[in-house]
Swiss-Prot record:
Lineage, top ranks: Bacteria, Bacillati, Bacillota, Clostridia, Eubacteriales
Taxonomic source organism: Clostridium botulinum (strain 657 / Type Ba4)
Keyword field: Hydrolase, Multifunctional enzyme, Purine biosynthesis, Transferase
UniProt remark on domains: The IMP cyclohydrolase activity resides in the N-terminal region.
A GO term, aspect molecular function: phosphoribosylaminoimidazolecarboxamide formyltransferase activity
Protein name: Bifunctional purine biosynthesis protein PurH
Protein family per UniProt: Belongs to the PurH family.
EC number: 2.1.2.3, 3.5.4.10
Catalytic activity line of the entry: (6R)-10-formyltetrahydrofolate + 5-amino-1-(5-phospho-beta-D-ribosyl)imidazole-4-carboxamide = 5-formamido-1-(5-phospho-D-ribosyl)imidazole-4-carboxamide + (6S)-5,6,7,8-tetrahydrofolate; IMP + H2O = 5-formamido-1-(5-phospho-D-ribosyl)imidazole-4-carboxamide
Pathway: Purine metabolism; IMP biosynthesis via de novo pathway; 5-formamido-1-(5-phospho-D-ribosyl)imidazole-4-carboxamide from 5-amino-1-(5-phospho-D-ribosyl)imidazole-4-carboxamide (10-formyl THF route): step 1/1; Purine metabolism; IMP biosynthesis via de novo pathway; IMP from 5-formamido-1-(5-phospho-D-ribosyl)imidazole-4-carboxamide: step 1/1
InterPro entries in the cross-refs: AICAR_Tfase_dup_dom_sf (IPR024051), Cytidine_deaminase-like (IPR016193), MGS-like_dom (IPR011607), MGS-like_dom_sf (IPR036914), PurH-like (IPR002695)
Length: 499
């Protein structure tokens, strides 16, 4: 039975209802600082923690609850005679419930505060109390999540106590919270690219209907700190997002964020099927659609500019899963909402391209994101690309970064007309891209040509310029073919494998 509770919360959501319920059951309530004031002002009978400890709040609030009279009452095992004898001798009363939520370090670390100001939001007393309560969960109910208040109230109403299964779950939530909280603090203080221990702080954003396939369960977690596009987007219309939707949306958004120009990316199964740049939203959508009018069906379309009504009217002519953009005209949004299942996503944050992580069985691979497009760019053939061809070549390299290797993209007039990816050899990727493009002008490759066969194939389709990293021991074979066929070729010095 709960006879004594300690309440100290930053987030006061629901705390009055809980406190008044406890008071109605003759539970003695101890509290601190702002929580004490809040409860007292709202008519709850409450004891200031200073009356229990005999010590005033110290060091600008850094020391309030760090006292044996508090922690002895939390940690004492009730069926341990020696424990109970000791706390009785020391005048310590057991504390049966601890209700604490922490200083909002997750939020404050993102605000425009000084380093020292952020440090002040690292909670010490709160974590110490909830860890103690969680360790002694058989005897102490610990609440850190406002969403758990109602369930605990109902259990007490029905059974006059909280069952051990619930207590254990609540204790587990403490250590789950603390691992995320401590991870955020650790990463803030260390600022190391590859620390000795990789601690990640993510919170469940939503449960998903299923994973990549219907037989796989899934959930979506977002970072507790930092501003990221796939964390802060807003769904303005449509069904709930799926696992595949979020993965695809991430790549589509990253692709359009590569460009300063107005850009559109159509994407299916995590692979771009049409990408274009131009002067207007309507133009780039039309060009992206024309890249592959078959594959775009059931896919995702992303823009890096506000969507207008005219473009929206064209978007709803075909079946799409998602339209994502930094904003939508009011008229455009009304048009898109006529498709009730179409997910319309407003994404204002630019792609951060921070770190890439890939889980393997028993480990996580961590690497810098592929942020470097070019390094030592040089023309290696007798012929140089024209300015227009060079612009298309650079465009092609920005696109090919997001195509699974081996990857080839064929470009014409700011359109990725042919995309060949996911092939186990480069010539197959080239043939696929060239065949899809039909009449492309330039070609971009994510990695070097191991032989001269790609250049030979490109020549058959009338390609005028090629861009690739270079670095093969047989580079001269490709250079020779290009010189013989009148093709210009540029080496970038940067490979863009994507697996």
């Amino acid at each position: 039975m709960i006879k004594r509770a300690l309440i100290s919360v930053f987030d006061k959501t629901g705390i009055l209802d809980l406190a008044k319920f406890l008071e109605s059951r003759d539970v003695e309530i101890i509290s601190t600082g702002g929580t004490y004031k809040h409860l007292k002002e709202n008519g709850v009978k409450v004891i200031d923690i200073e009356e229990v400890t005999g010590f005033p709040e110290m060091l600008d609030g850094r020391v309030k609850t760090l006292n044996p009279l508090i922690h002895g009452g939390i940690l004492a095992i009730r069926d341990n005679e020696e424990h109970m004898k000791v706390i009785e001798e020391k005048g310590i009363k057991p504390i049966d419930m601890v209700v604490v939520n922490l200083y909002p370090f997750f939020n404050k670390v993102e605000e425009d505060l000084s380093f020292d100001e952020k440090v002040e939001f690292i909670d010490i007393g709160g974590p110490t109390m909830i860890r103690a309560a969680a360790k002694n969960f058989k005897d102490v109910v610990v609440l850190t999540d406002t969403k758990d208040y109602e369930n605990v109230i109902n259990e007490i109403k029905e059974n006059n106590q909280v069952n051990i299964k619930t207590k254990k779950k609540l204790a587990g939530k403490v250590f789950n919270l603390m691992s995320a909280y401590d991870a955020a603090i650790s990463n803030f203080l260390l600022e190391e690219e590859y620390p000795e221990y990789l601690t990640l702080s993510y919170k469940k954003n939503m449960d998903l209907r299923y994973g990549e396939n219907p037989h796989q369960t899934a959930a979506y977690y977002t970072s507790t700190v930092g501003k990221y596009p796939m964390k802060n987007f807003k769904k303005l219309n449509g069904k709930e997002l799926s696992y595949n939707n979020i993965k695809d949306m991430d790549i589509a958004w990253k692709t359009v964020c590569e460009f300063k120009e107005v850009a559109c990316c159509a994407l299916k199964h995590n692979t771009p099927c049409g990408v274009a740049i131009g002067d207007t939203i309507q133009e780039v959508y039309t060009k992206a659609y024309e890249c592959d009018p078959i594959s775009i069906f059931g896919g995702i379309v992303a823009f890096n500019r506000k969507v207008d009504k005219e473009t929206a009217e064209n978007l709803i002519k075909i079946f799409l899963e998602i339209v994502v953009a930094p904003d939508f005209d009011e008229d455009a949004l009304e048009v898109l909402k006529t498709k009730k299942n179409l997910r319309v996503i407003k994404c204002e944050e630019k792609s951060t391209q921070d770190k890439d992580m890939t889980k393997v069985d028993g480990g996580i691979l961590v690497q810098q994101s592929d942020n470097k497009l070019l390094e030592d760019t040089k023309v290696v053939t007798e012929k140089s690309p024209t300015e227009k061809e060079m612009n298309d070549l650079i465009f092609g390299m920005k696109v090919v970064k997001y195509v699974k290797s081996n990857a080839i993209v064929v470009i014409k007039d700011g359109m990725a007309k042919g995309i060949g990816g996911g092939q186990v050899n480069r010539i197959w990727a080239a043939k696929e891209a060239l065949d899809r493009a039909g009449d492309g002008v330039v070609l971009a490759s994510d990695a070097f040509f191991p032989f001269g066969d790609v250049a030979e194939e490109a020549a058959k389709w009338g390609i005028k310029a090629i861009i690739q990293p270079g670095g093969s021991i047989r580079d001269e074979e490709s250079i020779k073919v290009c010189n013989e066929k009148g093709i210009s070729m540029v080496f970038t010095g940067v490979r863009h494998f994507k697996h």
